[in-house]
């Protein structure tokens, strides 16, 4: 999934540039973060099957801590991307909405309560992607 922006970038621009790498890094970090969070609920199963997931290696709490670091780094990459591309203030509003949504994700799911993990995984990540994409697109017209 993180390589999809690279394909679009190269198709449109015909080059591999630093902003494209930062965009791909942001997406990879974002995906890795929510995968760590979602996968933490499988700690017992992963352990019983001899899998080497983050939850097995670091516990559910550790997987959540890693997820937080990845989400913060992801938002930093999206912010840096906006600066590199000279996007307008509206793009940064989208990044702010994304950051707030990711913060909210971490506030409603914990290593001991996965009851809302599906809501986080599908609905909240959809909000992040739509907010950043829509605001990036609109920033070209404002």
Name what the model sees in each region:
Residues 1-142:
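Multi-pass alpha-helical membrane architecture of UbiA-family
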């Amino acid at each position: 999934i993180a390589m999809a922006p690279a394909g679009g970038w190269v198709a449109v621009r015909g080059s591999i540039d630093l902003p494209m790498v930062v965009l791909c890094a942001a997406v990879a970090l974002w995906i890795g973060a929510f995968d760590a969070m979602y996968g933490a609920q499988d700690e017992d199963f992963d352990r019983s099957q001899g899998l080497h997931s983050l939850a097995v290696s670091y516990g559910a709490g550790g997987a959540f801590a890693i997820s937080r670091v990845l989400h913060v780094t992801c938002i930093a990459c999206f912010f840096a991307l906006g600066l590199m591309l000279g996007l307008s203030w509206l793009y940064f509003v989208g990044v702010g909405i994304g950051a707030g949504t990711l913060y909210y994700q971490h506030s409603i799911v914990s290593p001991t309560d996965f009851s809302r993990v599906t809501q986080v995984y599908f609905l909240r990540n959809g909000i992040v992607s739509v907010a950043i994409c829509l605001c990036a697109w609109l920033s070209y017209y404002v």
